[in-house]
């Protein structure tokens, strides 16, 4: 259910996300390739199967092996990724390989049981000034730490995500 209010938009889920018809990336006004990884991550626990077809970049699925380590059911064949929704994801230590894939790992971590640690935050910080803070405003439990004592732009910082209390 979607309702507009003076202070924002309220979304209420009536249950599990459902798989969507094939997601095909395309130049504007088509589905943006930059959104593909995050949407894929959001659908990891959906009911059904979603097919992603990457028509812009040849090598856009660097995040998939990390998602699979968390229990995602994803099969890759060239530019096609087939995502079968699973009941649950398991927390893991994962590595962001790029900006969009890193954001996808954070989203997956919020769905997983346990504490997920996402390494190599410098990729994520290139495009999101404060992703942990922004998601915390939505109720996410995210902690960022610098494990090597370097500057804030050091690639060593990590983000730990905890699923919300209501996650199943």
Regions found by a protein language model. Give the residues of each.
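Short, structured segments at the rim of ligand-binding sites
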Residues: 1-168
